[in-house]
């Protein structure tokens, strides 16, 4: 299986399955002398880890990360950084009844058709469990970006049909929904409770923002910065659409509305483009939105086929998120950080 490495200079290779022994990552291309410790990476992992609230999956994984290489006396050495996380709360028996069935809406069918074999326990490699290592690697990328004054934050901007206004950035990490609006918490709670009671799931929109960038990051044509961001975000499990800036809303706009005018004193007067023009950063905030589909692992029966091609019915009884988009916030932040640190190092190599 190829496709397990991300990046050009700052590269991340991950391995591991949902119900395997461990998850691991190798980060190569990280500059030397960057202060780094397990506790720092753990802060990001704790934002993503399952079982933290009644609104997400009840699988309880501590997600304790161990640095096995690339760091000496608290600083990166410039050699590959090895990270490992042990899986501790697998319940593979939850999947024994569907080991020969393809769960509708999951990668079971396509993995089996491509490889002729699949790990049916929690989806194996296709599980969102894999994203723990992305978040760990993203923590390192964030550390480098912070040195250059670049900050990344994300928030849940919509759950189902419930749109959530951005009010208070500081509130994002103070609630289980990663929303920036304290007044919207009761509505989110009611919605998730209702969905879970129905044995169903719901989609979500996540917005991720990068601030403090200089103009000139990224490259034109096939290596456009927005293309790299879209590629990164679409690699996240359950993401079905990505937009930059105003995104699909620009369809209904006129050119006189959408163009971001510039003046000498005020600079850009708007940011409809989401901080990127011609594939290169403008120096404004980079803004991307991700659409997460509702998870297909639900208690309601669904029609499918088994490995022999016979019609069957599937009910997934494992522990699952009623809304996967909620825990998608730190993952989206990590992927944006990985894109930007890679582009930053590429830009520096051009200038050097």
From Swiss-Prot:
Highest taxon in the source lineage: Bacteria
InterPro entries with a match to the protein in the record: Chorismate_synth, Chorismate_synth_AroC_sf, Chorismate_synthase_CS
A GO cellular-component term linked to this record: cytosol
Species name: Francisella tularensis subsp. holarctica (strain LVS)
An annotated Gene Ontology molecular function: chorismate synthase activity
Enzymatic reactions: 5-O-(1-carboxyvinyl)-3-phosphoshikimate = chorismate + phosphate
Biological process according to GO: amino acid biosynthetic process; aromatic amino acid family biosynthetic process; chorismate biosynthetic process
Name assigned to this protein: Chorismate synthase
CDD domains associated with the record: Chorismate_synthase
Subunit and partners: Homotetramer.
């Amino acid at each position: 299986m190829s496709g397990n490495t991300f990046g050009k200079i700052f590269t991340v290779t991950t391995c591991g399955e949902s119900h395997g022994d461990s998850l691991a990552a190798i980060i190569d291309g990280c500059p030397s002398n960057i202060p780094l410790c397990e506790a720092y990476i753990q802060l990001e992992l704790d934002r993503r880890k399952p079982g933290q609230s009644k609104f997400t999956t009840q699988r309880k994984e501590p997600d304790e990360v161990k640095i096995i290489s690339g760091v000496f006396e608290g600083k990166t050495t410039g050699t590959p950084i090895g990270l490992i996380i042990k899986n501790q709360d697998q319940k593979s028996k939850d999947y024994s009844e569907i080991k020969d069935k393809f769960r509708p809406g999951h990668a079971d069918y396509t993995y089996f058709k491509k490889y002729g074999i699949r790990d049916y326990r929690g989806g194996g490699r296709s599980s969102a469990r894999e994203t723990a290592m992305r978040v760990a690697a993203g923590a390192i990328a964030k550390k480098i970006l912070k040195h250059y004054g670049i900050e990344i934050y994300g928030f849940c901007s919509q759950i189902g049909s419930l749109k959530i206004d951005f009010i208070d950035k500081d509130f994002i990490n103070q609630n289980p929904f990663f929303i920036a609006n304290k007044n919207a918490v009761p509505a989110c709670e009611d919605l998730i409770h209702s969905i879970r009671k129905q044995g169903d799931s719901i989609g979500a929109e996540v917005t991720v923002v990068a601030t403090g960038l200089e103009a000139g990051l990224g490259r034109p044509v096939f290596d456009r910065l927005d293309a790299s961001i879209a590629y990164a975000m679409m690699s996240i499990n359950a993401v079905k659409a990505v937009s930059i800036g105003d995104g699909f809303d620009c369809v209904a706009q006129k050119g006189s509305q959408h163009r971001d005018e510039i003046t000498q004193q005020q600079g850009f007067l708007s940011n409809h483009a989401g901080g990127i023009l011609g594939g290169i950063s403008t120096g404004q905030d980079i803004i991307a939105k991700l659409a997460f589909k509702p998870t297909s692992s639900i208690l309601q029966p669904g029609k499918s086929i088994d490995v022999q091609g016979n019609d069957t019915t599937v009910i997934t009884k494992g522990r699952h998120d009623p809304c996967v988009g909620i825990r998608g916030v730190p993952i989206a932040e990590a992927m944006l950080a990985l894109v930007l640190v890679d582009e930053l190092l590429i830009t520096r190599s051009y200038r050097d």
